[in-house]
Amino acid sequence: MKKLLKLLAIFLLFSSIVSSSAMASSTRTVTDMTGEKVKIPNKVNRVADLWHANNQVVLLLGGQNKLVATTPLVKKQHWFTVVGPKIVKVAAPLAGNQIQVEELVKTKPDVVIASDQAQIKESRQAKLPTINAMYTDFTGLKKSVTLTANVLGGNSPRIARQYNKELTNNINLVKQHLKSCESTPTVLHIVNSTDLTKVDGQKTIVNEWIKLAGGKNAISKKENQISVTPEELSKANPDIIIVGSTSTAHARKALRANRQLNQLKAVRENKVYGNPQGTFPWDRYSAEEALQVLWAAKTLHPQEMKNVNMVSEVQKFYQKYYHYNLTAKQAKQILAGEN
């Protein structure tokens, strides 16, 4: 009897070791953008992406079929639905910025990707492996793309390396073209046409591409999406105005109709532009920042960037990463901010 019990104990111990080993080998640990170590399945098949901008990264990396949850905003992005029409059928378990936890859990995600701290906390409380992919500059963009690729696995890391190299090359191309340029136009970046006094200041990714493109931010205050007065904008009197999340035609119309702002130099000289919008707006947290740096430099310094054909650049990018052949007309619509 003692011998039997001893054998049983050995068997149970061995089974426990094998089970623990199998469990360990079925998961892996990734470090998110905040340094948090998150344990996720070795093979990720189901992704809940609660950060609008990162859905585009998943699409670019070839992981769209793994999306089981997205956001309502992403489902309304025209060019995203054109390039990846399956997105309209993906669940969107959000009410405003609030997670509908039960609905999120129902999607059975292997991993949740987010950027909002409150959402991340809620998701982790629901025992869902949750990764923070947030970034605030171009270096962070590259790291976030690499992180997302590592989560997705498969061919995604190779695509991420290709993309990061292209982003670096485009930045270097702009620097090369502008190295002898002496003018530095002042640029005002307005968040959207709904509130013309909400702008982007220093220490932002917007400020970073303005500088890369050979411009100077007209706003000296720091941070994203800050409110300023019409008087402050009049004092800044920018050479160029770029408005996010709208078309060039609508941006010009909105500023001309504003009695407090229609005498700004950029408005009078017709140097107002809607920021391009593709599968996601280019100006803020976007994988299409690789195109933004080229567009911004050409907008600020058309002569120095005359050899860069933006229609062709957009078409090549979409074919390479989204496997979608844009017409010249479609590329021009994206460049004009028509979404």
Question: What is each PLM-predicted segment?
Answer:
Residues 49-107, 111-116:
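A short, structured surface patch at a secondary-structure boundary
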